[in-house]
Amino acid sequence: MLVLLAFIIAFHITSAALLFIATVDNAWWVGDEFFADVWRICTNNTNCTVINDSFQEYSTLQAVQATMILSTILCCIAFFIFVLQLFRLKQGERFVLTSIIQLMSCLCVMIAASIYTDRREDIHDKNAKFYPVTREGSYGYSYILAWVAFACTFISGMMYLILRKRK
């Protein structure tokens, strides 16, 4: 049981770390001479422009920002609730509250990555002065980490739903 508990805790912390890196790091769309994410655009590795309200489709990027932040926060809250439930639940009960919050985190990261996937081309086309060389880019590792975090939070949420507290 102790090994299972250690695995679940490590898996949850890994999920939270993936969410944090995907949210903060600047590599959602990358190319040879640039990298961009939902916070800023950098060309030549030195010239960075912060995305603000003068940006076309800013509300779309704000939706991605908000859902990624919310996903990270919910994942952390789920971890703390799991730790509390370890000491509070009676033997044989399930970690339903932890599961629900973790699955909400999963839903938020899925929404963020889906919005970015769907709207990326429009964002780049409408902001050509900010994205002069982005046609030759591809999805970066932060974007991929967001989708990996989606899978991890989903699996984690389902584990909590199935898991029962034992002695």
From Swiss-Prot:
Tissues showing expression: Expressed in ciliary body epithelia, sclera, cornea, and retinal pigment epithelium (at protein level). Expressed in lung and endometrial tissue; expression is particularly abundant in secretory endometrium (at protein level). Expressed in placental villous syncytiotrophoblasts and cytotrophoblasts and on the membrane of interstitial trophoblasts (at protein level).
Phenotypic consequence of A10T: In NPHS10; decreased amount of CAV1
Glycan attachment points: N44, N47, N52
Compartments (UniProt record): Golgi apparatus membrane; Cell membrane; Apical cell membrane; Membrane raft
PANTHER family: EPITHELIAL MEMBRANE PROTEIN 2 (PTHR10671:SF32), EPITHELIAL MEMBRANE PROTEIN-RELATED (PTHR10671)
Annotated function: Functions as a key regulator of cell membrane composition by regulating protein surface expression. Also, plays a role in regulation of processes including cell migration, cell proliferation, cell contraction and cell adhesion. Regulates transepithelial migration of neutrophils into the alveolar lumen, potentially via mediation of cell surface expression of adhesion markers and lipid raft formation. Negatively regulates caveolae formation by reducing CAV1 expression and CAV1 amount by increasing lysosomal degradation.
Family: Belongs to the PMP-22/EMP/MP20 family.
Disease as annotated in the protein's UniProt record: Nephrotic syndrome 10: A form of nephrotic syndrome, a renal disease clinically characterized by focal segmental glomerulosclerosis, progressive renal failure, severe proteinuria, hypoalbuminemia, hyperlipidemia and edema. NPHS10 is a steroid-sensitive form characterized by onset in childhood and remission without end-stage kidney disease.
Complexes and interactors: Interacts with PTK2; regulates PTK2 activation and localization. Interacts with ITGB3; regulates the levels of the heterodimer ITGA5-ITGB3 integrin surface expression. Interacts with P2RX7 (via C-terminus). Interacts with ITGB1; the interaction may be direct or indirect and ITGB1 has a heterodimer form.
Protein name: Epithelial membrane protein 2
Organism in which the protein naturally occurs: Homo sapiens (Human)
